[in-house]
């Protein structure tokens, strides 16, 4: 259902450069509809509004979708509430997106057999030309990933 929502959100835009923040806001609203009643989790978006190609927007949205879904499902077991943050940072050649939670931390996310994380790793490495980092401990999990900015989205190029 989430992948269909991502596709619907992205195809509502034209073929040109896509600002990521509005897409992620719509994705956030989908999460609140999907998980809001079951999980009283505060989902926050912050940082730079990156403009990327439609393809990059789709890939970033898929990765964020998977990471936020994992956080909703696994980070807050045995807890009444929590917080998930999605932080965007724009760099000169690379941009980064970090999905972090203040949950219980998990080694599951590093598990080689975790299909969702394999999808994240492959999408970031192969499609976004970037790298995924995983940090997990008793204060939560942080999964930053970086990616090469598609220069064709800049004006004048």
Pin down the residues of each PLM region.
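Conserved short strand/loop->alpha-helix "switch" segment adjacent to the catalytic nucleotide/phosphoryl-transfer site
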Residues: 18, 36-66, 72-83, 111
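Short beta-strand/loop element within the Bergerat-fold HATPase_c
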Residues: 81-93
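Glycine-rich nucleotide-binding loop
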Residues: 83, 105, 137-144
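Acidic ATP/Mg2+-coordinating residue in the GHKL
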Residues: 101
């Amino acid at each position: 259902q989430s992948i269909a929502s991502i596709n619907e959100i992205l195809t509502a835009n034209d073929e040109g450069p896509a600002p990521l923040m509005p897409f992620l806001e719509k994705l956030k609203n989908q999460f609140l509809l999907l998980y809001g009643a079951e999980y009283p989790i505060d989902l926050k978006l912050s940082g730079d509004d990156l403009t990327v190609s439609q393809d990059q927007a789709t890939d970033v949205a898929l990765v964020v979708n998977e990471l936020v879904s994992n956080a909703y499902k696994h980070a807050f077991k045995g807890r009444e509430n929590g917080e998930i943050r999605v932080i965007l940072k724009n760099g000169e050649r690379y941009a980064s997106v970090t999905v972090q939670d203040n949950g219980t931390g998990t080694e599951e996310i590093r598990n080689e057999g975790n299909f969702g994380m394999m999808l994240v790793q492959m999408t970031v490495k192969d499609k976004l030309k970037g790298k995924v980092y995983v940090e997990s401990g008793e204060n939560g999990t942080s999964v930053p990933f970086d990616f090469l900015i598609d220069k064709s989205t800049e004006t004048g190029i």
